[in-house]
């Protein structure tokens, strides 16, 4: 997800320290898992969400995070590229720099 690419580096005097102090774990999800999470939120809950905000959902759906008890994640959509979102929810390929995320129709 494009908006996850910056802002928390070691030189960032605010975000890095806050993340270091408050995070329990860090999990890496793939662009394909983000793609799928965007589809799930749209088709299951009718939520239009940007890629960066669905990483928590992607981690759960992929089995990389196994929630125990009530679990929450923040879902936003303000920085959403609607053309890209339309490609995702309609199962089309998405080009991210030099990488192509192969489209897949939801539910298949």
Predicted segments with their positions:
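Generic secondary-structure boundary/loop-capping signal
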Residues: 1, 26, 45-46, 72, ...
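Anionic-ligand binding region
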Residues: 1-6, 13-14
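Glycine-rich beta-alpha junction loops
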Residues: 4, 8, 32-34, 53-55, ...
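A generic structural signal for secondary-structure junctions
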Residues: 5, 9, 90-93
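Active-site-adjacent helical/loop segments in soluble small-molecule enzymes
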Residues: 12-68
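Phosphate-binding loop/pocket of nucleotide- and phosphate-handling active sites
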Residues: 55-108
């Amino acid at each position: 997800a494009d908006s996850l690419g910056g802002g928390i580096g070691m030189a960032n005097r605010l975000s890095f320290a806050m993340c270091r102090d408050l995070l329990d774990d860090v999990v890496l999800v793939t662009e394909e898992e983000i793609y799928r999470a965007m589809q799930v939120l749209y088709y299951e809950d009718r939520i239009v969400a940007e890629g960066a905000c669905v990483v928590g959902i992607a981690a759960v759906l992929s089995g990389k995070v196994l929630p125990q008890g009530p679990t929450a994640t923040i879902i936003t959509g303000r920085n959403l590229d609607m053309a890209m979102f339309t490609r995702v929810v309609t199962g089309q390929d998405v080009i991210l720099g030099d990488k192509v995320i192969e489209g897949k129709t939801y539910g298949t």
